[in-house]
């Protein structure tokens, strides 16, 4: 079972996968109090969006910096040290042992939680085979989850399809953050391992990352409210 002390609104993380800072700020204003947690990934970060993390934290929001760090240990450590000053709640690294160890050690006294990305939700067994892996998705996710927990990583980024299995492996304390969330009737897009918000929560997800179903909705605020309501209903709140 996922940790129970997270407000329903904060279980929804809206991915600000937008082209520039101005557009992202406008979306945050439009969503208002309906959203309390935002993700800043490659697109916005590389368009000058990292300062938005500080602004959001200053406004009482939570921030997930999703840069999926992966390099030699020293380089990862220096990156984590720099990014920890943004005040973010979450920071992602790829789930390779040296990368995870460096990130956990470099975090120091900051409050940022290190999340390990197991296998991207756009990958399936065939994609892994094409990349030279001898494991399928399920086995690779499980192996990386066990390594992450042993190293002291705070949580995992995984497909909602793996959430129930992983919850049984890592127990109730680790955060499970699941992209690949699509409300009923929404297009899958480039995601291959997807699930509705209610089913993901029931499977043991702690947080749901949602981008296009909110950002591209005719009324993004209403779309976010509907997802939070679905989360609350799934939890019996």
Curated annotation (Swiss-Prot):
It comes from Rhodopseudomonas palustris (strain TIE-1). Substrate binds at residues 17, 39, 66-75, 121, 182, 191, 211-212. The lineage of its organism: Bacteria, Pseudomonadati, Pseudomonadota, Alphaproteobacteria, Hyphomicrobiales. It catalyses: orotidine 5'-phosphate + H(+) = UMP + CO2. This is Orotidine 5'-phosphate decarboxylase. One of its GO terms (cellular component) is cytosol. Coiled coil: none annotated. Belongs to the OMP decarboxylase family. Type 1 subfamily. One of its GO terms (molecular function) is orotidine-5'-phosphate decarboxylase activity.
